[in-house]
Amino acid sequence: MTIKLIVGLANPGNKYLLTRHNVGSWYVNQLANNYHVSLINKSSFLGYTGYLNIGKRRIFLLIPTIFMNYNGQAVAAIAKFYNIMPEEILIAHDELNFLPGYARFKYSGGHGGHNGLKDVIYRLGDNNNFYRLRIGIGHPGDKNKVIKFVLDTPLDTEQQLIQHAINESVLCTSLMFQQNIAYAIHQLHTILK
């Protein structure tokens, strides 16, 4: 199976642009920049969209412009329009259980308390069989501080580590286009130990 849609989960607007919760959108923006693709706000897909032409394949990009807890609406809208199956989707999102500088590809699984993922699973018909790119942001150490933590900007040192993980993830995504998903997963997991 090949990836046909890459989504960076996000909250909308400048207020949230640089927050930890939006690191998935940082990844999609970096990927678009590397391939010289402009993302355009498309209201029918509830987000910024564009596509990459890789050989004979077209891979769609999406950054939702609705709040994180409803990002699944945007994913479902574009997937339905282009007839993209859940297993052909890669969702990039922030991961509290990983330290900054760490990222991992994963296939399937639960939402782990991430409301954006929870909505994606729900909107895809309670189907969790899609790929994820989990980008580490760290944990505040107290579950009562999580909401404020994810909606804050990372410290400068954390930002550098997160950006490094995103850069490596984008390189490995390019390997996925050239080789296959298994190869990209192996490379990313080898680079970011």
UniProtKB/Swiss-Prot annotation:
Q: Where in the cell is it found?
A: Cytoplasm
Q: In the record, which residues are listed under signal peptide?
A: none
Q: Which residues bind tRNA?
A: Y16, F67, N69, N115
Q: Which reaction does it catalyse?
A: an N-acyl-L-alpha-aminoacyl-tRNA + H2O = an N-acyl-L-amino acid + a tRNA + H(+)
Cross-referenced Pfam families, in alphabetical order? Pept_tRNA_hydro
Site annotated as Discriminates between blocked and unblocked aminoacyl-tRNA: where?
Answer: N11
- The entry's protein name is Peptidyl-tRNA hydrolase
Give the organism the record lists: Baumannia cicadellinicola subsp. Homalodisca coagulata
